[in-house]
Amino acid sequence: MFFRSIFTSAMILFSGSSVVHGANSPGCGKDLPRVQEPGGSYSTNITTKDGRERSYIIHIPSNYDKNEPVPVIFSFHGRTRTAKSQEKLSQFSNEEYNPNAIAVYPQGIKNQWQGDPSSQGIDDISFTLQMLDHFEDRYCIDRTRVYAAGKSNGGGLTNRLACDPTASKRFAAFAPVAGAYYQNVTEDNCRPNTVKIQCNPARTPIPMLAFHGTADETIPYTGGGRRGRCLPSVPHFVREWASRDDLGGKNETTTTNGGKVEVSRFGDHGEVVHYRIEGLGHAWPSTEPNSDNPDGTYVDATPIIMGFFDQWTL
């Protein structure tokens, strides 16, 4: 019932966000691109500034009005996955969860993102900002309500956007799931509970909501050396964000589901929140079976993310 109430509150709040907030983008008043209609998802190409042909899927909410600014949610897939699989996994195109925001699912080059140890020097932060420029020019966007979420390597990119001095000024809040926060430290020198996390946001606080399962064998909760790099432990990652946001070391921790779900909130307004899910593997949390977890788990990440995003604007 607790998580159902979060879901209901999130839908009520988010459904009114375009009325409450009004930082209109230049795209307000323009018709949708040809072949695009409210309620549909469309695969689209874009040529980046370095001449690369990139792609993404964009979902237009059914009630989209070219004169009413709406939020935008970027959702980044995990390594080896695709924009299409991320749309299905994260469910931001499901209007039961997200009735109003445009949802965007970018496609990584070779199905991976900047920050992965095998990435080929592609600047995905620049790519993301170029997409955002394009959307603001072409659609009616509330520029104070742009958000990023992602799974695994996509969660790592979500964190990199939060840490980037330019991107952090254009995104209001961030939600990595089972994030891969690789640091440029060798495995031999990896100290997961103390490793320095490279991060230079241009503002504080940066709202951050992080989900992670204790049984994640791909990106272990305890961190450690992997693929030649160093993964911070998830508690260290979360504490560093609380410190960076000047929230102090104290947090309020609650448990549900017989202690299987632990929720830690830092700051008077919960600027940094962490969901620790006992026994969950490398998965996007859902009470229903999904492509990550055929058995489901104790909580639904997507409506919780929607409720968190609704708290924050630039």
Explain the meaning of each model-derived region.
Residues 2-7, 13-72, 84, 101, ...:
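A domain-start/cap signature at the N-terminus of enzymes
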Residues 70, 77-81, 280-281:
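Active-site glycine-rich loops that stabilize anionic/oxyanionic intermediates
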Residues 73-78, 105, 210, 276:
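Structural cue for short, hydrophobic secondary-structure segments
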Residues 79-137, 272-274:
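Active-site machinery of serine-nucleophile hydrolases
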Residues 107, 149, 175-178, 209-212, ...:
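Alpha/beta-hydrolase-fold catalytic nucleophile elbow
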Residues 140-152:
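Alpha/beta-hydrolase fold nucleophile elbow
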Residues 172, 178-253, 265-268:
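The feature captures the conserved acid-bearing segment of alpha/beta-hydrolase catalytic domains
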Residues 211, 229-233, 239-314:
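C-terminal catalytic histidine-bearing segment of alpha/beta-hydrolase fold enzymes
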